[in-house]
Each structure stands twice: as structure tokens, then as C-alpha cells.
Amino acid sequence: MNNKTEMGSSTSGNCSSVSTTGLANSGSESDLRQRDLIDERKRKRKQSNRESARRSRMRKQKHLDDLTAQVTHLRKENAQIVAGIAVTTQHYVTIEAENDILRAQVLELNHRLQSLNEIVDFVESSSSGFGMETGQGLFDGGLFDGVMNPMNLGFYNQPIMASASTAGDVFNC
């Protein structure tokens, strides 16, 4: 019986050692499963991070491409504006030169008008001695319609004849 008891005890000892080993194995299997899960999560997280970084690089590249296209567009637009400014400046210079000419012509015409007004004033003040009625102007029955009318003056209708001998006589006096 002792043998049986020993056997029984050894059997029971074996069972307990098997169950202890089984518990130890199941604990290490559980740890392995947890480690595998943790490793799987790490691997998935790394993969997710790689994908996120790839998407981020793609967004960054797209943004860079958009900015490059915008720079190209703005440079073209700037070149067009500069060309437009050059054309407008040339038009301005041309118009300014024309305005300078017109201003000079206005001054000349104002001087001529002033001279003509002085002549008219002189003729009107001198015409009072010719027996003109008061209220008559130069052209409405006044001086030019009467005696001073170029059409009434005979020498305006005569041709001017000059020769070298008559010119010498006139200038040698």
C-alpha cells in the first residue's frame, strides 16, 4: 500500500506538478498572447503612422505645387502689368508732348489775339477822325465797309510789277 500510497502520492504529486506546469504554461501563453497583441498594436500603429506621414508628405507636396503654380501665375500677371505700365507710360509721354505743343500754340494764339485786339482798338480809336457815325463797327458799315474796304481800294486790284532796275531805284534813294 505504501507503494500505492507512494504512487498515489506521486500520482497526486505528478498531477499537481502537471497542473502547476500547466498553470505556468498557461500564464506564459497568456503573456505571449498579450505580447503578441501589444506587438500587433505597435505594428498597426507604426503602419498607421507611416500612412499618416505619407498623407502629410502628399499634402505638403500638393501645397508646394499649388504655391509654385500660384507664383508662376502671379509672375505672368506681373509681367502683363509691367508691360501695360510701359505702354501707358509711352502714351502718357506722347500725350504730354502733344499737350506741350498745344500749350505753346495757345500762348502764340493768345499773343496774336492780343496784337489783333490792339490793332482793332487802334483802328477804332483812329476811325473817329474819318467821320464814321458812332455805333458803327469796323465791319458793319464802318471803316472796312467804306474807304478802307480792300475791295474798294484800287491798288489791291492791280498786279505788282517789279524788276531789278526798279528795285535798285527804290533802294538807292
From Swiss-Prot:
Keyword list, A-Z:
DNA-binding, Nucleus, Transcription, Transcription regulation
Which PROSITE patterns has this protein been placed in? BZIP, BZIP_BASIC
Tissues with expression: Expressed in the micropylar endosperm and radicle tip in early germinating seeds.
Q: Where is this region: Leucine-zipper?
A: 67-81
What compartments host this protein?
Nucleus
Gene3D superfamilies noted in UniProt: 1.20.5.170
Q: What happens when the gene is disrupted?
A: No visible phenotype under normal growth conditions, but seeds have decreased germination speed after imbibition, without affecting overall germination rate.
Q: Where is the composition biased (Basic and acidic residues)?
A: 30-41
What the entry lists under InterPro entries is as follows: bZIP, bZIP_plant_GBF1, bZIP_sf
**Record note on quaternary structure:** Forms heterodimers with BZIP1, BZIP9, BZIP10, BZIP25 and BZIP63.
What is the designated name of this protein? Answer: bZIP transcription factor 44
